[in-house]
Regions:
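AAA+ P-loop ATPase mechanoenzymes
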Residues: 1-99, 107, 123, 361
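Active-site catalytic microenvironments for nucleophilic, acid-base chemistry
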Residues: 37, 146, 302, 306, ...
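Ser/Thr-centered flexible coil motifs
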Residues: 62, 66-68, 258, 328, ...
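Walker A/P-loop NTP-binding motif of AAA+ ATPase domains
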Residues: 9, 73-291, 303
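Exposed alpha-helical structural elements
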Residues: 54, 68, 72-73, 283, ...
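Short, flexible/disordered secondary-structure transition segments
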Residues: 28, 32, 36, 41-45, ...
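C-terminal engagement/docking regions of AAA+ P-loop ATPases
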Residues: 2-8, 286-298, 308-375
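Long, contiguous hydrophobic alpha-helical segments, chiefly transmembrane helices and signal peptides
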Residues: 21-34, 113-114, 194, 240, ...
Length: 375
């Protein structure tokens, strides 16, 4: 009888032990699932894995090891082979393109030529500035394409996080990932919105992020062999923090195109399109005073609709049409009569930056290399 009671107690103990073990295992699973859903970088990590596989395949090396923060930044890595912009597809700016090739692209493509001494080496910071629509972002993409460097497009929205301390870790991930993928270009468009002048009214998180960015930037500038470059673009160079300007020793003004450059832009835009052979590009360019490269692209897009409209009108009238006619010079001139250029924005840019004592606007036409003058 006693033995039976003892066996019953032992069985009950084993059952309770198994129940507790099952409960603990279930609790761990629930906790693990909950933590996975709380991870702000979970979806970004999945997307980044595909990017890493693609980059590893192009570079011909095994998949790189990255942490969760680098996975988030990897989502903004662009394979240079997938960039459809090159110097040949950018009209005008010939002198600047030549300077960028010598100072930026060549050291990234042929590092062995710049490995002797301290005077030569990859540029660590380059600034492209000028009015809106003049092709700064296109130039940045073309640099990545021509150099074969991976293009890390840094967006401030991706660096901000609701989790304390994550912003600094994401900034650190930008540079650590660039090191692993070098040659690499870290591109910051509208850099004034991220690295503008520091003010007492700035949020503490933004200030800490700027400080972390500059500290890490200083770290790789001391490494002469690192093929990592920060490329920034802005419409407001006078708004940049002076500490940032010191880290961007090579600065290029991408100004409004002149008549010859406007004609070149028109020819590049219309290359490969169905156009009449007798278009006088120089004459059309003379009518486009104050137009940026972006304006000229929109001009051609609007003009391309005229042949389509005429074709549809013919079809509505019951007439047989073989296809839209070629785009003509008259189409371009018709659009010019009603189009709106961004010259106002360009004028605002000139006025704003001429008021800043730190930026001189009087430059020789052949002075393609513009140094940021800080007083």
């Amino acid at each position: 009888m006693v033995r039976g009671m003892g066996g019953s107690s032992e069985t009950k103990f084993v059952q309770e032990l198994l129940l507790y073990a099952a409960s603990a295992a279930l609790s761990c699973l629930v906790l693990f699932a909950g933590l996975r859903h709380l991870d702000p970088n979970r979806e970004s990590s999945k997307k980044a894995l595909e990017h890493k596989k693609e980059i590893a395949k192009r570079l011909g090396r095994p998949l790189i090891q990255t942490n969760a923060y680098e996975d988030v930044i990897a989502c903004d890595v662009i394979n240079p082979d997938h960039i459809d912009v090159e110097f040949g597809s950018i009209g005008g700016l010939e002198t600047i393109k030549q300077a960028l090739y010598e100072l930026v692209i060549l050291p990234l493509r042929r590092p062995e030529l710049f490995s002797h001494g301290k005077l030569l080496g990859p540029q660590k910071g380059v600034l492209l500035y000028g009015p809106p629509g003049t092709g700064k972002t296109m130039l940045a993409k073309a640099i990545a394409r021509e150099s074969g460097a991976v293009f890390i497009n840094v967006r401030i929205s991706n660096l901000m996080s609701k989790w304390f301390g994550d912003a600094q870790k994401l900034v650190a991930a930008v540079f650590s990932l660039a090191y692993k993928l070098q040659p690499a270009i870290i591109f910051i468009d509208e850099v004034d919105s991220f690295l503008g002048q520091r003010r007492t009214t700035d949020h503490e998180a933004l200030t800490n992020m700027k400080t972390e960015f500059m500290a890490l930037w200083d770290g790789f500038t001391t490494d002469q062999n690192a093929r990592v470059m920060v490329l920034a673009a802005t419409n407001r160079p006078s708004e940049l923090d002076e500490a940032i300007l010191r880290r961007l020793p090579q600065a290029f003004e991408i100004g409004m195109p002149d008549r010859r450059e406007r004609a070149e832009i028109l020819m590049v835009v219309l290359k490969g399109e169905k156009v009449e052979d007798n278009i006088d590009y120089d004459h059309v360019a003379s009518l486009c005073e104050g137009y940026t490269g972006s304006d000229l692209l929109e001009l051609c897009k609007k003009a391309a609709y005229f042949p389509i409209r005429e074709l549809l009108d013919e079809e509505r009238k019951g007439k047989q049409a073989t296809g839209p006619r070629p785009l003509s010079q008259f189409d371009l001139e018709k659009v010019l009569a009603t189009s709106r250029k961004t010259g106002i924005a360009a004028t605002e840019y000139t006025t704003l930056n001429s008021q800043s004592s730190g930026w001189s606007r009087n430059r020789e036409p052949d002075d393609y290399q513009v140094q940021a003058a800080i007083e």
